[in-house]
């Protein structure tokens, strides 16, 4: 597995859970002897939903809600088989979406 790179992309609505998960991944990879670059914060995606407050009329009265999706990127350079095995066994919170590319 020499000169390979694992790219891990994390997404979550809560940035605290996201940072805790990123630290767990970095700590696990460093313990197994791999070189880690990150966590790199990526731009936060903000989605705004505008709805009418009233049911039938009063179009001027609206309410806005937003959803923020926080993202982090972690690169693991030259991972060992032990690194891959320990990352597979890692237990992360359910609010974090993980994409792994080899």
Swiss-Prot record:
The gene is rpsJ. Part of the 30S ribosomal subunit. It comes from the Bacteria. The keyword Ribosomal protein applies. GO terms for molecular function: structural constituent of ribosome; tRNA binding. Pfam families: Ribosomal_S10. Transmembrane segments: none annotated. The keyword Lyase does not apply. GO terms for cellular component: ribonucleoprotein complex; ribosome. GO terms for biological process: translation. Involved in the binding of tRNA to the ribosomes. This is Small ribosomal subunit protein uS10. SMART domains: Ribosomal_S10 (SM01403). Keywords: Ribonucleoprotein, Ribosomal protein. InterPro entries: Ribosomal_uS10 (IPR001848), Ribosomal_uS10_CS (IPR018268), Ribosomal_uS10_dom (IPR027486), Ribosomal_uS10_dom_sf (IPR036838). It comes from Bacillus thuringiensis (strain Al Hakam). SUPFAM superfamilies: Ribosomal protein S10. Belongs to the universal ribosomal protein uS10 family. NCBIfam families: PRK00596.1, rpsJ_bact.
